[in-house]
């Protein structure tokens, strides 16, 4: 039986994820923590406690109880934080990182002290930055294990798989559509060629890729720019954590996509840190399933690499105290087919 802690459980994503985690028999204790005064995590826990499953619920409100929430946890989910409406590009992701970095750093330092053996799953946006912040904070603390730190990329893989299956009529439960490289709008690379019967015309692949990359922005606009897709994000995040628990408790379990430090960068297109399908076992990440790419996907990956490196470097700099500089190869933080209103002025200034 496992002890699972959810940091940020009072947020929209945290509440949805906690609802699904409460239903898992493998969890002995589900510890819900939040330090935001407006997030009534005790009320969330009391509500979930009415669900007649075997998992026990504990609630911790306030920073003074972070130690108790994390003590001897087997899995820690760091979620929640601020979101920019609508999500757009790396320029806004950098701003968002400054809002959320303290939440992630404080949680990571506490994990290093009170549950250094735990697997950390980072969902707080932007995941690319916060994964690096978490990993390098643990390195500074001397307890880093690359097998036990991952960035949650489940929402992007789930969206890509749903799009693919809605067109082909395939069963989503029997099909996987990997999303590699990173987790952000400018860094996610859906690999439709790896899915079964994925022989689409290039124009359709372009459209599907754009839908995956702009999914956050689309759903935000549908909701009148008031919120993101918390239900789908919470569900996919919970599914990722459940698969981690199955790997710990039952044996090797497949996860459709997670941002991790690769075992051999040479086998992952020269990228030491990359989101790929992985296998999780009793000691954490045990295997990396790097998909083969077609020419379009290879070009998209090359275009996305410097964006991912920039985001990872931003997180690293604030973990170790280095000064951050924008990646020298970056000209516009947006994806290639449509620069956004945020970045267009910056691009014009550079051309002068």
Predicted regions and their residues:
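Conserved glycine-rich cofactor-binding loop
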Residues: 10
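C-terminal substrate-binding/catalytic lobe of Rossmann-fold NAD(P)-dependent dehydrogenases
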Residues: 140-148, 153-345, 352
